[in-house]
Amino acid sequence: RELNSARQLLLWLWGPLQLGLEGALPLQQSSPFNEPSGTSIQLKQRNGAAVWDAIHQRLERAVTGGLSNATGQMLAIEGLHPERRRELLLALLRQLNAVLQRLRLDQQASAEKRSDRALSEHWQALQPELRKQALCTMAGHYVRLPMGEELSGVADHLILNTELEDIDEELPNPKRMLAPFLDDQPVLVDGQLLPADDPRALLQLETLVSNWLVRTAELIGSELLGVCGDWPELRRYLLDQRLISTRELERLRNQLNTQSRWQAWIQRPIRLY
């Protein structure tokens, strides 16, 4: 009863915006990355490992070549210095590659770890360390900046003052994203089960990995914006030039918090109902 009441309230408030336009065209679904012109994809072999290698290379080229925000939403990583943002995304890709290799070896060594539940639990357990390693790589293991009268290690400071174990419920399902790479499982695309090396399946897997990459970078980026306020030198090193001012940094954080609440309280319930 309560859920139905909430649904009716949301439709009454927002229904005219969503349902009341005759002949309206649906908005195009945006990808965090601009798609390169054409979809020329070459695979060394027709298996999950080769598909992952192709996706890995495509995303590395996209990140290295520079990204533009096509999500229609404000992103925390846009507040980072362009070089730090690029280093963070590349570090996450490298960590994902290392995790896939580890999962593949673990599954070969133990049949028990091949179940969907074991895969999901193992994947979730590896996320905090994956984020920590990517953060350290982005910050620079040996970079030290003035803090008062002393030099302080940037990576150590960030690890001590960030929370990297938060759970994002919008992250892709581990089985859907990982199983085709690990076990050569087929991919469900528009009601069809396709092999992972089919171009349609490959592009869907690339979208899932892109989603994971950007959302994980967002978790880290939000934490970074929160720890830079009291350390001017860290702001100059990590953040975009426009956010060196504490006032501008706080304004961006407030805007991101407002956007997050809007998505959690309004947009997500509407999608669920």
Where are the language model's segments positioned?
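Polyanion-binding and phosphate-handling cores
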Residues: R1-N69
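Long, charged low-complexity terminal regions
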Residues: L92, V99-Y273
